[in-house]
């Protein structure tokens, strides 16, 4: 009977405990440092989800509490209110927050190629069937309804693409669309095309019959590397924990780069309604590189900030250098060089 087996097991355990010699010194488990981290449901966060599930943070003594949020706009608000210690989101919400005096600090990248400037390879424009926008022909966006998440990376991305072909935002109709609703907007013809970050372009391609890619990346005036952001207050209170967090995140990135299909499967447990096929497609060529470089600052100054000014999302240009702190990535590179071994070395002249 189950009761008898359970009793016998308990009795055996008690007997073993009585007969076992007591340890010379009682072992106590070291308390873990709690870190509250907000992330979006973006494919670029696969390394983070992998690091959480594979225990990379806990092995470093961190108790990471995860907050899922729709976009960087909500994460910035959470950082500003002090309800989270760190956040993973896009360049444009980060720079907008800095321009408004929010005390946020960039301490690493999520999706990124430290050797590239400009870069927009996490973003794509996807069209529905019969949208009238041939692949590669951005001029045909004129007069179309474009689904974007207002205030997030897709909006300045589409603005940059339009500028490249002599169009402006006045030539199109922007439809404010939540990331998870992008495919639905195409299917219901609420939008002719969508401009979004992965995995939402891949989700549209796999879920909406007849949908196709108009352009992948391709913005010549965009610098939109994913950002790992904290606050000045968190740095003052939890600098060591943040150092360990960046180390664990870098290790998660290294694992995800080597195991993209498995990282995609892990991400399905964190991104509602997303399947492994879609996430595998989204992660296939996504650059994952936590390192900061001079390309970060140059990209912000040359492309990201001027674009935000031109779109009247920030009042004026500013120098972002004071809001970029490389010490945490530098510490991670020193602590575990193997987590960076598969990445191309940053040229000496481009290092921070």
Stretch-by-stretch model annotation:
Residues 20-26:
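Sec/Tat signal peptide C-region and signal peptidase I cleavage site
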Residues 107-116, 123, 128, 134, ...:
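Catalytic cores of transferase enzymes with a strong primary signal for eukaryotic protein kinases
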Residues 236-317:
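Secondary-structure end/capping motifs
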